[in-house]
């Protein structure tokens, strides 16, 4: 009975547990927790839209994350590491930019922009490294690639007995699967160029890739002068030995001899501008507030970025604070303030709001508590810090993020290029516009400046709809000149001769003006080229009577204005763009094709007269400078004339067709025959575009490209045979995890006996998860030691010397041999004694020797480095996996 019970237990255990069944981690005291770094965001990140979270959001710009604009904000490192990195980047500029730039100019503006770009690139890398789980990447992906590399070395060693030929045999074993960068040094440089270009959208500031000259310069500096020497440094056997000693050394880590340095903003000192001259590309928010045209441009820029509500929140809180700080608030005022606070909470704090802004949780909780409590509690906000800190947070975003972005935006460049010649340069926004100072200088605040009014003011500025029966014309504007509507919105104040006699500071009230269109007249077109044949075009005669200045002693004024048919539609489109549509004041459908002669205009006279009269009765247009210009003689001529499309004259087009269809009489036969003969000849090869290659400031290109250590890499031609070798690339890799990797190395490299291999397979169920958890924990501890301040400074110094110290003497051969010997001894001592008893001393020596010899081959190290680099790049930039076309473009030339 006991025997059968034992058999039944064995059968049950065997059937219930298979090779895929694994016992959980049995070391409860060792728990590896992946490092999670909470990075501040401008707006909450949703599934698609970073602002509102909607999948199909058409309002906001996607991915409004902090790292997209100024990734160095809230990023701090120790001052010593920061100084070391700054020194390396300074050497990059000193060696690869200043030697030729100083011959051009001594202005530091361009170099200052380059400093910001390099800081942006380094900050993006730091943030993305923080986001990935380094131990998991090492154990799950990098070690797997290393296993494949080890198998190639083992198969190559079976073919050659002499270590001198191991590298060439391994390269032949790789066959066509050799990394494309290893074919030759020029292919390696070309690969780094393509890789750098592929990463530009993610490592450079937004829209920086639009500047072709800047991207070419940065590409050559990074690929030829930074990445190539860095990869040479990492693949150098002497460097590999140094890193191995650091990793497998069980002695206590070297303690820092000096106390830890304080944390400083990442590369802030490096990015400080060196240019002593004031730059027009640097504005303060205060300057924008003081100039109405700049404020309008800034608001339009925020609209494009999907961040108008950031400015709207700032203005709303300013108004709210001014009202709540009044002494002795009445119940009605407290009730009004409480209702406004509820709107603030619902608009900017709720997750479902499209205008939600990310605040600290305690800020949202405090605002929610007051908003949902009795209205009397609103006075507590006078002493609470929640609303003040929310305002400071949003103001910081405007000053530190969006203002610098605005200074590099197309909107601001339009202001710089056209502001001097445009009448909008010194103009003021009309009554429907918004000014930050309006909220601070206005004495009568009260209910009229509530959040609803503020929201409608901002949103009304950017409302863009098409009038019923009207078409918003293009007016023949060339590409890149699409902002003429903006210039019509921010209109002239003092160009009209009628306005010149106005009393200073006298408000204009267009509602008191009286207009009529009594008749249609003819007007000679001044744009006609020939004076004797000036075209007479029909125009509307508008009689204007101004009666709004009687209070200051002015008599009613009368004048007449002549406007063309299309000028009315220019006025309509500009008013629509700025103020939205007016349902009770609309022009009839515009005639696109057909004559616009005297009879046609006469039939439209009453409709156009009614349209203007209704516009004058709208309160929001009572002080409109645009409408006043339209009704003033010589007012805004360029606004309403320059952008008009010429009339489409079908008669002229039809009359010109027969002339074009006349039968040719052979006068063009000879050019046709010559072109035909040329088309039959094979085209001559076009000269290749010269490539700018910046490799070294002190050595010739070939000296840097072909060095003594790596020679010409594998020295393969591009058309090498494509025959597939019978190696691991044709086999399915089933190993997964550190336990499987150890079994694989034990079987392939250390040649463990069968009984030990079977025992390890049996204990895999019990210890696989435990070993892998311990490995992640161990790697994390080692990485923390490696990332200590003094060690990081040491590694950065070594990298600096490898790239820039060309004139210094390299490590002597004796020092390198001493380092290699120490590495071999450390590897021998790293193997546990229990394993040595199972496999024997001789097998241990041969196996370690095989691994050690494989690591002493520079080209093989470079192969492994590039394979690992590709994996790391895909982990740091997972967006590359989703863009198949870009990936194909990089590998198509392989």
Swiss-Prot record:
GO terms assigned for molecular function: phosphatidylinositol-3,5-bisphosphate binding
Domain PX span(s) in chain numbering: 518-638
GO cellular component, as recorded: dendrite; late endosome
Modified sites of kind Phosphoserine: 496
Subcellular location: Cytoplasm; Cell projection, Dendrite
Location, primary (coarse class): cytoplasm
Record's keyword terms, sorted: Cell projection, Cytoplasm, Phosphoprotein, Protein transport, Transport
Record-annotated PXA domain positions: 78-252
Gene3D superfamilies associated with the record: Phox-like domain, Regulator of G-protein Signalling 4, domain 2
Boundaries of every RGS domain copy: 284-416
A single BP term in Gene Ontology: autophagosome maturation
One protein family per Pfam: PXA
PROSITE patterns assigned: PX (PS50195), PXA (PS51207), RGS (PS50132)
Annotated SUPFAM superfamilies: PX domain (SSF64268), Regulator of G-protein signaling, RGS (SSF48097)
Family of the protein in this entry: Belongs to the sorting nexin family.
Task performed by this protein: Plays a role in maintaining normal neuronal excitability and synaptic transmission. May be involved in several stages of intracellular trafficking.
Name of the protein: Sorting nexin-14
Native source organism of the sequence: Pongo abelii (Sumatran orangutan)
């Amino acid at each position: 009975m006991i025997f059968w019970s034992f058999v039944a237990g064995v059968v049950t255990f065997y059937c219930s547990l298979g090779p895929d069944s694994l016992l959980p981690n049995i070391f409860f005291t060792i728990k590896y927790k992946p490092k999670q770094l909470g990075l501040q965001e401008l707006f909450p990140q949703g599934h698609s839209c970073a602002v509102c979270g909607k999948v199909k959001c058409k309002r906001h710009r996607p991915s409004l994350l902090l790292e997209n604009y100024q990734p160095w904000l809230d990023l701090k490192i120790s001052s010593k590491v920061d100084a070391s990195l700054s020194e390396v980047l300074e050497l990059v500029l000193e060696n690869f930019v200043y030697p030729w730039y100083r011959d051009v100019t001594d202005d530091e503006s361009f170099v200052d922009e380059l400093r910001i770009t390099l800081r942006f690139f380094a900050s993006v890398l730091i943030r993305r490294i923080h986001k990935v789980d380094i131990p998991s990447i090492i154990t799950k992906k990098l070690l797997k690639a290393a296993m494949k590399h080890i198998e190639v070395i083992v198969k190559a060693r079976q073919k050659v007995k002499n270590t001198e030929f191991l590298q060439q045999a391994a390269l032949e074993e790789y066959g066509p699967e050799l990394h494309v960068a290893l074919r030759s040094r020029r292919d390696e440089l070309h690969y780094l160029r393509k890789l750098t270009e592929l990463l530009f959208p993610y490592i450079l500031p937004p829209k920086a890739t639009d500047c072709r000259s800047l991207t070419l310069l940065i590409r050559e500096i990074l690929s030829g002068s930074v990445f190539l020497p860095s990869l040479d440094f990492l693949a150098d056997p002497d460097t590999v030995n140094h890193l191995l000693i650091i990793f497998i050394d069980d002695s206590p880590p070297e303690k820092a001899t000096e106390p830890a340095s304080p944390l400083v903003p990442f590369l802030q000192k490096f990015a400080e501008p060196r240019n002593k001259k004031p730059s027009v590309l640097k504005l303060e928010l205060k300057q924008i507030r003081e100039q109405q045209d700049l404020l309008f441009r800034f608001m339009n820029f925020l609209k494009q970025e999907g961040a108008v509500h950031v400015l709207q929140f700032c203005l709303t809180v300013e108004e709210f604070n001014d009202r709540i700080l009044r002494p002795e608030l009445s119940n009605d005022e407290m009730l009004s303030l409480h209702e406004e606070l509820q709107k603030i909470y619902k608009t900017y704090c709720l997750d479902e709001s499209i205008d939600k802004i990310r605040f600290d949780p305690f800020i949202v909780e405090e605002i929610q508590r007051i908003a949902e409590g009795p209205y009397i509690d609103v006075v507590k906000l006078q002493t609470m810090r929640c609303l003040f800190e929310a305002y400071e947070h949003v103001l910081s975003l405007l000053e530190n993020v969006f203002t610098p972005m605005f200074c590099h935006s197309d909107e601001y460049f339009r202001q710089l290029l056209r502001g001097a010649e445009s009448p909008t340069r010194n103009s003021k926004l009309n009554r429907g516009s918004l000014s930050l100072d309006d909220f601070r200088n206005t004495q009568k605040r009260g209910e009229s400046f509530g959040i609803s009014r503020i929201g409608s003011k901002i949103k009304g500025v950017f409302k863009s709809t098409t009038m019923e029966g009207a078409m918003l014309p293009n007016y023949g504007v060339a590409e890149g000149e699409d902002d003429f509507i903006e210039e019509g919105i921010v209109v002239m104040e003092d160009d009209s001769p009628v306005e010149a006699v106005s009393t200073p500071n006298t408000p204009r009230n267009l509602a008191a003006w009286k207009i009529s269109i009594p008749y249609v007249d003819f007007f000679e077109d001044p744009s006609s080229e020939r004076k004797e044949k000036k075209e007479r075009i029909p125009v509307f005669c508008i009689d204007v009577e101004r009666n709004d200045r009687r209070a200051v002693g002015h008599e009613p004024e009368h004048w007449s204005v002549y406007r063309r048919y299309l000028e009315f539609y220019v006025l309509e489109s500009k008013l629509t763009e700025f103020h939205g549509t007016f349902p009770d004041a609309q022009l009839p459908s515009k005639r696109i094709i057909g004559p616009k002669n005297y009879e046609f205009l006469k039939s439209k006279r009453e409709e156009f007269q009614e349209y203007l009269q209704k516009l004058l009765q709208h309160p929001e247009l009572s002080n409109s400078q645009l409408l006043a210009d339209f009704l003033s003689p010589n007012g805004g001529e360029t606004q309403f004339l320059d952008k008009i499309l010429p009339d489409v004259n079908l008669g002229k087009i039809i009359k010109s067709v027969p002339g074009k269809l006349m039968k040719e009489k052979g006068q063009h036969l000879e050019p046709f025959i010559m072109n035909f003969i040329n088309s039959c000849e094979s085209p001559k090869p076009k000269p290749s575009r010269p490539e700018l290659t910046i490799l070294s400031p002190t050595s010739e290109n070939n000296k840097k490209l072909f060095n003594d250590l790596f020679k010409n890499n594998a020295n393969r031609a591009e058309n090498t045979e494509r025959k597939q070798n019978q190696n691991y690339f044709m086999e399915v890799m089933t190993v997964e995890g550190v336990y499987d990797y150890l079994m694989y190395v034990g079987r392939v490299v250390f040649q463990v006996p069968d009984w030990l291999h079977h025992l390890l397979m049996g204990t895999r169920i019990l210890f696989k998860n435990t070993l892998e958890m311990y490995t992640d924990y161990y790697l994390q501890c080692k990485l923390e030691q490696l990332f200590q301040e003094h060690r990081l400074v040491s590694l950065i110094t070594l990298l600096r010397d490898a790239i820039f110290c060309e004139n210094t003497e390299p490590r002597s051969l004796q020092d390198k041999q001493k380092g290699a010997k120490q590495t071999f001894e450390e590897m021998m001592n790293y193997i546990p004694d229990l394993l040595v008893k199972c496999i024997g001393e001789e097998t241990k020596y041969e196996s370690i020797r095989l691994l050690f010899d494989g690591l002493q081959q520079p080209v093989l190290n470079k192969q492994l480095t590039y394979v690992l680099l590709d994996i790391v790049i895909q982990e740091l930039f997972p967006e590359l996996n989703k863009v198949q076309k870009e990936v194909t473009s990089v590998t198509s030339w392989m």
